[in-house]
């Protein structure tokens, strides 16, 4: 599912809301998650999961084409850990 499909689905399930308002809400939620992570904060959506940022240390890598050793800089990467309810639902344990 892509963002526009998510917006469409929410609009269909909430006919009292205009689609442009749903789009604004969805975009705001995503922006707030991104902003919080950029500040180094953890975003927890209870039952769904938690978004956080992990630091990957600098290291020596290898160019797969040439075999040459290359230096890979330290970087921060987004990380998502699923919540218990999401894991249970995906594994059919909530029935």
Curated annotation (Swiss-Prot):
<dbReference type="InterPro" id="IPR000119">
    <property type="entry name" value="Hist_DNA-bd"/>
</dbReference>
<dbReference type="GO" id="GO:0006310">
    <property type="term" value="P:DNA recombination"/>
</dbReference>
<dbReference type="GO" id="GO:0030527">
    <property type="term" value="F:structural constituent of chromatin"/>
</dbReference>
<keyword id="KW-0810">Translation regulation</keyword>
<keyword id="KW-0238">DNA-binding</keyword>
<keyword id="KW-0233">DNA recombination</keyword>
<protein>
    <recommendedName>
        <fullName>Integration host factor subunit beta</fullName>
    </recommendedName>
</protein>
<comment type="function">
    <text>This protein is one of the two subunits of integration host factor, a specific DNA-binding protein that functions in genetic recombination as well as in transcriptional and translational control.</text>
</comment>
<dbReference type="GO" id="GO:0005694">
    <property type="term" value="C:chromosome"/>
</dbReference>
<dbReference type="InterPro" id="IPR020816">
    <property type="entry name" value="Histone-like_DNA-bd_CS"/>
</dbReference>
<dbReference type="InterPro" id="IPR005685">
    <property type="entry name" value="IHF_beta"/>
</dbReference>
<dbReference type="GO" id="GO:0006417">
    <property type="term" value="P:regulation of translation"/>
</dbReference>
<dbReference type="Pfam" id="PF00216">
    <property type="entry name" value="Bac_DNA_binding"/>
</dbReference>
<dbReference type="GO" id="GO:0006355">
    <property type="term" value="P:regulation of DNA-templated transcription"/>
</dbReference>
<dbReference type="GO" id="GO:0005829">
    <property type="term" value="C:cytosol"/>
</dbReference>
<dbReference type="GO" id="GO:0003677">
    <property type="term" value="F:DNA binding"/>
</dbReference>
<dbReference type="InterPro" id="IPR010992">
    <property type="entry name" value="IHF-like_DNA-bd_dom_sf"/>
</dbReference>
<keyword id="KW-0804">Transcription</keyword>
<comment type="similarity">
    <text>Belongs to the bacterial histone-like protein family.</text>
</comment>
<keyword id="KW-0805">Transcription regulation</keyword>
<comment type="subunit">
    <text>Heterodimer of an alpha and a beta chain.</text>
</comment>
């Amino acid at each position: 599912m892509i963002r526009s499909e998510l917006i469409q689905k929410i609009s269909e399930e909430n006919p009292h809301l205009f689609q442009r308002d749903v789009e604004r809400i969805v975009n705001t939620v995503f922006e707030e998650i991104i902003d919080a992570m950029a500040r180094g904060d953890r975003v927890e959506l209870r039952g769904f999961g938690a978004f956080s940022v992990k630091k990957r240390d600098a290291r020596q890598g290898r160019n797969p084409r040439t075999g040459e050793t290359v230096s890979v800089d330290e970087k921060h990467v987004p990380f998502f850990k699923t919540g218990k309810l999401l894991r249970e639902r995906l594994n059919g344990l909530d029935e």
